[in-house]
Amino acid sequence: MFQAQGVKLVRMDDVARELSVSKKTLYELFADKEELLLEVVKVISMGFHQNIKEIICSSANVLEQIFMLYKRVIKHCREVNPLFFIELMRYPQVQTFFEQVHVQHADRIKEWLQMGVKQGLLRDDVNYEVFLRQDGFQIDKLLINPEVRKYPAKVIYDSVVLVMLRGLATDKGLEIIKQWK
């Protein structure tokens, strides 16, 4: 419900009705809307992590993993109301959770980038620690930027992810990128 309609429009009454439980029961399980949202976001995050594991197991190299994940993110962005992401940031517990997840993702991405170097697909002369710290890499923030939000998610990701990957890729990596484009 929240992903389809945004956070503001969905009331606890709506959630109770959708789940076929009383509002009292819902409030026994969740103290308030923020606590419910935090649990919703945790479930979404667990599904995303499971998807990442499947991608890693089914791909031949790190660039393939990145592109498969990229496709998954684009699909998710098309299915979710952009207001969902924007409105979530008004809830401190959810924001804290996202900050923790962002640190975990940065660690995972660093591992992927190092693996790409070992596979000869990414340049070895880049300080990936510095690269990951730059605000430009925080792609998730692009989706809540009102100036950027007017563009479809695929355009945003193509304009940012592909450009970054091309800059990081070796000649061998560029050949793989061309195949996925």
Where are these regions (language model features)?
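C-terminal peripheral helix-coil segments that are non-catalytic and often amphipathic
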Residues: E111-Q119, Y151-K181
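Short hydrophobic/aromatic patch on the recognition helix
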Residues: S20-F30
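Amphipathic alpha-helical segments used for helix-helix packing
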Residues: R72-E99, W180
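Residue-level detection of the helix-turn-helix DNA-binding "recognition helix"
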Residues: R17, A31-D32, K42
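Hydrophobic alpha-helical connector segments
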Residues: E39, Q50-E79, L132-D135
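Short, amphipathic alpha-helix enriched in basic
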Residues: M1-E18
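Short amphipathic alpha-helical segment with a characteristic S/N-K-E followed by hydrophobic residues
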Residues: L9, D32-L37, G47-F48
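Amphipathic alpha-helical packing segments from all-alpha helical-bundle domains
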Residues: V94-L121, E129-I144
